[in-house]
Amino acid sequence: LGYTIAQNLYVSPKNLLVEGISDLVYLNHFSAVLKQMGREGLSEDVTIVPVGGADKIATFISLMRGNELSTVCLLDTFTDQSAEARLKKMVEKKIIVDKNIIYYHSVLEKNFADIEDMFTKDEYLTLYNGTFGTCIKNDDINTDKPIMSQLKRLNNNKSFNHYAPANYMAKNIGTLTFSEETLSYFEKLFIVINNKF
């Protein structure tokens, strides 16, 4: 764990902790796109720190406390009860304040969401199908439910590499377009994040 942390730990006075590299890729891309349009992206003085999973969030917060660093967490809805319990304990001990924990589901005003739910379903399916050579259609997906759990179900309940579609997006950015709905979700997210620092 110490080695993983040392590899990932590039910090600045203002740090946004996210679960993985895919969060970093999506957030950086949409921040740049929105700024080019004259809209709000992530503040330049905020560093995105991918920690390698929800289970490592609490460890990173512990490492950063006491260093006069401002830390905000941006998380998928918890599915790991132990990671959620560790974070709640840190809030109780005032190691991090509850208002500095942002969940994608709160920005999207849903009960459950991952970063992939910031996209319209058809846009994320374009990334997924392009990555894995599949032909999943919008009709195969329930628009009211989180997309990742549905894709896992359609993949015989096997997990898949969440970074791969983000990497596909980065490599094919010139041929991809995203809707105003998706851009608005990301802009709303950046406004929420920027207001926390």
Task: State each model region's role.
Residues 1-80:
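RecA-like P-loop NTPase motor core
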Residues 22-25, 59, 110, 114, ...:
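Generic recognition of stable, solvent-exposed alpha-helical segments in well-folded globular domains
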Residues 30, 122-123, 127, 131, ...:
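Generic structural signal for hydrophobic core residues of well-folded globular domains
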Residues 44-47, 97-101, 174:
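Generic structural motif recognizing short loop/turn segments at the entrances and edges of beta-strands
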Residues 61-62, 87-91, 190:
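Short amphipathic alpha-helical segments and helix-helix/interface helices
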Residues 77-164, 168:
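Activity-critical C-terminal alpha-helical subdomain
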Residues 150-152, 159-197:
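Terminal low-complexity/disordered tails
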